[in-house]
């Protein structure tokens, strides 16, 4: 795990949990609060309030992170974590150092106003695996002006961006 937390109780709790579970991490402590998300359920449908100006908006490209990426078998990154310029540049730089045969999984997170087509395309060119849920799939279909079946749209992304795999997860209505 590569990220940033605040020098606060939540940040300490996160680092302690990673350590307890023997998860290798490069977590930088920064002078911003640890990020939180408030989730409200209205008739079973979640709405998110994603707090801004938090630690994970300030991830730095350390030499240790680049060294780790160069040896990685897999890297997972998302679009939400790239909402700030600093973290976007860091995540994209670190991801670019992964070996060509490593899995570079883009777990797209299309939340509120924290994405645009440019960010998605930049991330797709770094990825070789794309994971989306059914709601995100429909947003991507509209954003890229695509028609066709789920399979046809998935194949378009695979061909256009040179993906190894396109993973579409279904919500509870499709289980």
Positions of the model-derived regions?
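Short beta-strand/turn micro-motifs composed of small residues
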Residues: 3-5, 108, 170
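Glycine/threonine-rich flexible loop motifs
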Residues: 49, 82-89, 140-144
